[in-house]
Amino acid sequence: MPALLFYLLGFCLLQGQVTGRVTYEWMMENVKICRNDFVRTAIEVCGHVHLERESPSPENPFLSSGPAAETVPSSIKKDAENANTMLESIPNLPQELTATLFEKQPSKLYLQYLPTLKKSNVSFEEFKKIIQNIQRGVQGSSASESNTFSRKKRQFSESLPEECCKYGCPRYYLLMYC
């Protein structure tokens, strides 16, 4: 009977042990991983992110429990998207009006990365800088360069294990497998 209690105590201690906080530096670290190591590292990254979400800390507001965003019915989202497409199709609409309308709605790029942002230890300001750099890069290129960029990004995503094996990749690239 006492041995069972010791096993239960050990199990409880192991369950309560936190493997460590995910830091920005750890996620940005470039690692060269191949085959089984790639899968192990992806599982490790997903596990760290899951643990961070389950045990939020007061110093990291993105990981706090509670509603992350206002819940909006899908019909309202569809109406907003329809309104946006209609606004874009009007050729003589003043720029001030369209600018104020688009400022009220969050960027689609921001919404795309919102789940990852909540799971990571990256501050909101750092995240905004990253998004702005991405937007500047896409806006600064011509249409043909933009298509090339999109194609290159797609090809990189399809062969991520090979790229990580040959050249290495930051751990945050593995978040797409979570």
Swiss-Prot record:
Does Secreted appear among the keywords?
yes
**Compartment(s) where it occurs, according to its Swiss-Prot or TrEMBL record:** Secreted
Hey, what's the signal peptide range on this chain? 1-20
What induces it, per record? During squamous cell differentiation. Repressed by retinoic acid.
* Disulfide bond entries: 34-165, 46-178, 164-169
What's the main place this protein lives? secreted
- For this protein, the parts annotated as crossing the membrane are none
> Record's superkingdom?
Eukaryota
One GO cellular-component annotation of the UniProt record comes to: extracellular region
Recorded hits in InterPro entries, A to Z, give: Insulin-like, Insulin-like_sf, Insulin_CS, Relaxin, Repro_Hormone_Insulin-like
Q: Which residues form the propeptide?
A: 54-150
Q: Which UniProt keywords apply?
A: Cleavage on pair of basic residues, Disulfide bond, Hormone, Secreted, Signal
Q: Which family does it belong to?
A: Belongs to the insulin family.
Instruction: Kindly state the subunit structure of this protein.
Output: Heterodimer of a B chain and an A chain linked by two disulfide bonds.
What's the protein called, per UniProt? Relaxin-like protein SQ10
